[in-house]
C-alpha cells in the first residue's frame, strides 16, 4: 500500500530498471540511515513513504535515523505493512468481522463496497487437515475428503469472501502451508503499486509468519484485530526495537542439517534473551547459508522469542527468486532496488547493533530438542542418556510438573510468542500433581532404564511390545523443514538406503509426511524416491500443518488403549517447530523436534531409548549389523539429487493455478453478493454483535458505576487461559450451546475452528480448565460467583455474565502480573468485551493483549506501583465505581482514574489506577468503542 508522502526530506526520486521507471523514497536523503541494520532501513523507508505529518512525522523518521542501539525501546512508530497473510483458523474471524462491517456501513447509510482491504490480503487454508488416515496410498485423498466434511461451512464462507472483497485471495485446502506458499510464491521482496517501488513487508495472523524473513522480507505475527486494521489501512503501532546482530562464520559439517543449526540457534538466543527484539544475521558466513536454510531460521523466530529473525538481500536471495519462477523483470527490480537503497548485503560493512552474538557453523552437531520445549537442545550423541534422565519425570508420580522441573506451566504453550498456530488438542499441565517422586508404574531395570513392557496384539499391525519411550508418531511435517529440499531429499535418500539394506519402520509408529508445498511431491516423483518413503510407511497424508499444530489424528486404537491403560510415557518425533506438552497428541507426553532424516531414523529405531552410535537399526540380508552411519546419505548424493530432481518449471506449474483448487473447492455452493447471507442455523459462522446500535458519531465515553468482579485472577494469566483454543469439554456452556443446536459430541471440533461463531467463543471465554478464579476456593475452570443470586453461589462465568447483563450491571476483571501473556489471540479481548467486561485492572499487562483490549473498547487499568488486589484488601465481593474515564471526552487521556470499592458492610477502599491507554491513537480507538468502529466511522466520513 502506498500513500502520498509529505516528503519532508526530499527523498522522492526515480529508479530506472531496464525499460521501466519506478518512484522510490531514497533512504540516503535522510542523514545517518547508512549505519542502520537492514531491518531498521526497511522500517525507515516505511515511515519515509507514509509520512503524513500527523501519525507519521519528520520527528519519527529522524528518531529511527538517529536510533541509539544501546537504548531501551521507548519511541513509538506507526508501521504500515504492505500486505497481510492469514491461515484459516485465525483468518475466518477476520473475514467475519469485515463482512459485519459492510452491513454496519449500509445500516448507517454508507456504501458497503467501501469496506475492502487496502493492503493485499492472502489466506491459505492449511490448519484444518488432520492426519486421520496414514500408511496407505489413499491417505491424502481420504483426509481431504474428511476435511471438507468437517469444514465445508467455513470454506463456503471463505469462497464468498474471495468473490466479495477486492485484494483478498484464498489458497484452497490441499495446496500447501501459508508460510511456504509465502516464500515460494506470494512474497515479491520489492513491491510495486501505483508506480511506486518499496520493500515487501507483511503481518500475518500466525506466529511463524517470520519464515519470510529468510527472503529479506520484514514480517511477523499479529493478532486478528491488528491484522484486520492493517488490511483496512491502519498502521501497526510498535516501539523501535533493539536489534541483535547474529554473526555467522564457518561452514556446516557433513552429516549436519539446517534443522541442527536452527535448534542450536534457538538454544543460544533463548539463553541470551531476545524477547521483543529483532535478530539480524550478518557477516561473511551469510553467503554460505542457502535460502531454504535462512527460511528455516526465520520460521523459528517465535521460538527464539524475537519479533523477527531476518537475513538481508544478497545474491542468494536473487538466485532463489529466479529458481522459484519469479519473472526476470521482478528479479531485476529486487536487485536494483536493494542496491540503490543500501539494502544489499555487504559482508565487509558491519552495521551497528544493540547486542552481538556469533556462531561458527562448523561447531554445530546433529541434534534434537525436547521433550517439551524447542530450546531444550540435545546433541544426538547424548539423546539416549538424556532420555533416561528425563523419563523419570514422566512416569507414575514422577511428573514433569514436579519441583525439579519448574518450566512446565500452561503458559508455556504460548510463552513469549506472537500468535501461535493453535493446536487441535491441548492437554494442560496439572498444578495439583503429587510431588512424591517414587515411580509406581515402572520397574527400574538394572541398567537404569525405567521400563514397563506391555504386550500389544493387533490384527493389522501384528504383535509387539510397547514400553516407555516408544516412538508412536514419526512425522515429517511443518513448513519449518518441508520447505527445505536439502533435508527433504536427505530424508528420502536415507529411506532409500534403509530399504535397500532391508530395514523397516517399527509397526507401532504412526508414520506421516505432509509437505508445505506440492513442489515437494514433484521432486520426490522425479527423483524416484517416493516408493522408498512409502515402503517405510511415509505416505502423503496432506498438504498442511497436520502434526506440527496437533492435527496428528488418533493413534491406532490398540496402541492408544495400551498407552492409556498402562500409563505409558510414549514419544513423538517431528520435524516441526513446537513440542509443548500435550500439543502433538493427547496420548503422547514427550515430543522431540528433529530433522526429517532423523524422523525416519527414529521410525526405524522405534524408541527414544536408542543410541545411534552403538546400536544397530537392524541387519542386512547377510545378517550384518546396519547402523545409522551406514545409511546416512553423503552431501554429494544430496546435492546431485537436488540438481537432478528440482527445476524452475515445478514452481511455475504448481503455482500457476494456486487459487483455483480442486473439484471439491470449485463445486462448493457459494453465496454471492457484496454482503453475506448469514445462515441462522450455522454453528461455525455467525454475525457478531460488535456494531449493533452503533451511531455515525461516537457516544461520549462514560465512567463505570456499580460494577461487579467477574474474575479475580493471579499472575501470568495467558490468552490461552482467557480464550482456549483446544477441545470443547462436554457439559460446559459452549458444549451446551452446540448440543442445543444439534451438534453431536464427536463433531464439537475445537474452539480454534469455531472462531467464526461468537456464541461459541463467548461461552469459551475464561473457560480454560486450568483457570483459577480466586473468588472461589480450590476450583479450577470457567467458574465464578454470581452476585445477582442470594449468597453469590458458584456458577459458570458465562451464565453469571448473562445474569449481570440482564440487570445492566457492568463487570470488571482483576489480574496480577503479566496479564494476557502469550499468544496475541484476539478472541481473548473480543470475548472479554462480549461478556460485559468494561475494565481489566492488573498489576502489569502483556503489550499486545493490552492493545487488543483497547481495540475492543475495554479499558486496561494498572494498580499503583507495588500494589495488588490482595495488598489493597480487595477480595472481589465488592461493588466498584471508576471515575475520571470521562476526561477522554475532552480530547485528553487521564494519567489515572479513581477506583472506589464498597464492601458489603459499607466500608470503602479507594485507589488511583494508572490508565494504560499509551498513545493518542489508542485514545481515539477507545473513544470510538474500538478500532473497527474507528475505522468504520472514518470510512463513513470519507464518503
UniProtKB/Swiss-Prot annotation:
UniProt gene name: acn
Catalytic activity entry: citrate = D-threo-isocitrate; (2S,3R)-3-hydroxybutane-1,2,3-tricarboxylate = 2-methyl-cis-aconitate + H2O
Induction field: Transcriptionally regulated by Rv1474c.
PANTHER family: ACONITASE/IRON-RESPONSIVE ELEMENT FAMILY MEMBER
CDD domains, per database record: AcnA_IRP_Swivel
GO biological process entries: propionate metabolic process, methylcitrate cycle; response to iron ion; tricarboxylic acid cycle
Keyword tRNA processing belongs to the record: no
Gene Ontology cellular-component terms listed: cytosol; extracellular region; peptidoglycan-based cell wall; plasma membrane
Note accompanying the cofactor annotation: Binds 1 [4Fe-4S] cluster per subunit.
UniProt pathway annotation: Carbohydrate metabolism; tricarboxylic acid cycle; isocitrate from oxaloacetate: step 2/2; Organic acid metabolism; propanoate degradation
Top-rank taxon: Bacteria
Protein family according to the UniProt entry: Belongs to the aconitase/IPM isomerase family.
Cited function: Involved in the catabolism of short chain fatty acids (SCFA) via the tricarboxylic acid (TCA)(acetyl degradation route) and probably via the 2-methylcitrate cycle I (propionate degradation route). Catalyzes the reversible isomerization of citrate to isocitrate via cis-aconitate. The apo form of AcnA functions as a RNA-binding regulatory protein which binds to selected IRE-like sequences present within the UTRs (untranslated regions) of 3' trxC and 5' IdeR mRNA. Could catalyze the hydration of 2-methyl-cis-aconitate to yield (2R,3S)-2-methylisocitrate.
Pfam families reported for this sequence: Aconitase, Aconitase_C
Known EC number: 4.2.1.3, 4.2.1.99
Broad enzyme group: lyase
Subunit structure: Monomer.
Binding-site residues, [4Fe-4S] cluster: 479, 545, 548
Keyword terms: Iron, Iron-sulfur, Lyase, Metal-binding, RNA-binding, Tricarboxylic acid cycle
Keyword Transferase: no
pH profile of the protein: Optimum pH is 8. It retains a high specific activity over a broad pH range.
GO MF entries: 2-methylisocitrate dehydratase activity; 4 iron, 4 sulfur cluster binding; aconitate hydratase activity; iron-responsive element binding; metal ion binding; mRNA 3'-UTR binding; mRNA binding
Protein name: Aconitate hydratase A
